[in-house]
C-alpha cells in the first residue's frame, strides 16, 4: 500500500489537520455534492440547502467523529482492515450504507485537505493520501465481501 516514506509523509501532515473543522466540512460537502447520502442522516434536521448542511451542528459533530476514526486509522496504516472491522460491520449490517459512499467521502476529504492547505498539499502528498483513503474505503467495505 504505502512505502515507509509515504507513511511518514501522510502521518506528519495529518498532525496539522484540525479534525473538528475538516471533518465537518468533508461530511457537509459529501451531503451537498452527493445529496442521496443525506438519507443516512435524516435525524440531523434541516439539510435542505447547502448553507443548512454546512452550518448544521450535527453534521459538524458527526464529521469530527468520522475523522477521529480516520485518525485512528492513520495510526494503524498497516492494519486498516483490523482497525475498521467494527465500523465495517456497523455500516454493513446495521446501517446498510452503500460501500461506494466510503470512496466518495475519501475523495471529498482529499478535496477539503487541498482547499485548506493549498500549496502545502502537494501533488505527491495528494497521491499518498489517495492511497490512504482508498485503503480506508476498502477496509470499511470489507464486511460487504
UniProtKB/Swiss-Prot annotation:
Originating organism: Bos javanicus
InterPro entries: Globin, Globin-like_sf, Globin/Proto, Hemoglobin_b, Hemoglobin_oxygen_transport
Pfam families, A to Z: Globin (PF00042)
UniProt note on tissues of expression: Red blood cells.
Subunit structure: Heterotetramer of two alpha chains and two beta chains.
Annotated positions binding heme b: 62, 91
PROSITE patterns documented for this protein: GLOBIN
Keyword entries, A-Z: Heme, Iron, Metal-binding, Oxygen transport, Transport
GO terms classed as biological process: hydrogen peroxide catabolic process
Function summary: Involved in oxygen transport from the lung to the various peripheral tissues.
First and last residue of the signal peptide: none
GO terms for MF: haptoglobin binding; heme binding; hemoglobin alpha binding; metal ion binding; organic acid binding; oxygen binding; oxygen carrier activity; peroxidase activity
GO cellular component entries: blood microparticle; haptoglobin-hemoglobin complex; hemoglobin complex
Protein name: Hemoglobin subunit beta-A
Record-annotated disulphide pairs: none
Domain Globin residues, every copy: 1-145
Family named by the database record: Belongs to the globin family.
Amino acid at each position: 500500500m504505502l512505502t515507509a516514506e509515504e507513511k511518514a509523509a501522510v502521518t506528519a501532515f495529518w498532525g496539522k489537520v484540525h479534525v473538528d473543522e475538516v471533518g465537518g466540512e468533508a461530511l457537509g460537502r459529501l451531503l451537498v455534492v452527493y445529496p442521496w447520502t443525506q438519507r443516512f442522516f435524516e435525524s440531523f434536521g434541516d439539510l435542505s440547502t447547502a448553507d443548512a448542511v454546512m452550518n448544521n451542528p450535527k453534521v459538524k459533530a458527526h464529521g469530527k467523529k468520522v475523522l477521529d476514526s480516520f485518525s485512528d486509522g492513520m495510526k494503524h496504516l498497516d492494519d486498516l482492515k483490523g482497525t475498521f472491522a467494527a465500523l465495517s460491520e456497523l455500516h454493513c449490517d446495521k446501517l446498510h450504507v452503500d460501500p461506494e459512499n466510503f470512496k466518495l467521502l475519501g475523495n471529498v476529504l482529499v478535496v477539503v485537505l487541498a482547499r485548506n492547505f493549498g500549496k502545502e498539499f502537494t501533488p505527491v502528498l495528494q497521491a499518498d493520501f489517495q492511497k490512504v483513503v482508498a485503503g480506508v474505503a476498502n477496509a470499511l467495505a470489507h464486511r460487504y465481501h
